[in-house]
Amino acid sequence: MEYTKRLLVLEGLLSTLPDCQGWMIAKCRFSLGNRKMKTSDQLPLQILKKDGRLAKIHICSFAGEEKDLLDVTLINPGQRMTLGSRENMETEKEDHLFKVTREETDRYLREVKDQNPIHQGEGAIVPGFLMANKILKQLSPQIPFQAEFRFLTPLQIERSGWLEFLSSDEENDLKIEAEKALKKVQKIHLKTPQNIILKAEITEYKE
């Protein structure tokens, strides 16, 4: 199964979670091609913690002999959600433009059966998973890989941003050298003129 479809399977399971309409993703971690099986991962969706402001969810699905995992932290923003202004973007960032259209969003919401009202109507925001999927599609990491995303500010549908690819630093080089299972570590920021929308770290592993 193509890994984009594997992501959608994991994300669609989250849509079955009750009482989280209007909530937002604070952070998530995908792990595709994980062969280490735990008894606790037999259940497709586990609620590790949930109260009125925060929920931690563990999701598991299978692609043949490989296991895919998704750990998500959701937050209830209440009335505190703020969006950046719509100022023009810096022209020098055009090589890495990032924008999610209304059509893309509607198609994604249908695929995962997401009815969260924050993705509908005027001022609707892009689903966090959809941003993650677009970034992963652009990078095309090889399975097995792990991808961590931390969402800092909502991005409105049809608003442009850009991807900033951080060069490999000494810390990453030492990490790869120390852990022989690692093949590549890539860090990315999604930005607008006013905000950092998300921070991502994608780690590829040797098979």
Residue ranges of each PLM-predicted region?
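HotDog/MaoC-like acyl-thioester-processing domains
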Residues: 1-12, 19-97, 155-157, 164-207
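A conserved, well-ordered hydrophobic junction motif at loop->secondary-structure transitions
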Residues: 1-25, 97, 104-140
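A broadly conserved detector of short glycine/acidic/proline-rich loop/turn motifs that flank catalytic sites
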Residues: 102-104, 155
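Generic alpha-helix signal with a bias toward terminal, lower-confidence helices
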Residues: 112, 137, 161-163, 167
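Catalytic-pocket segment enriched in acidic/His residues
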Residues: 129-149, 154-157, 168
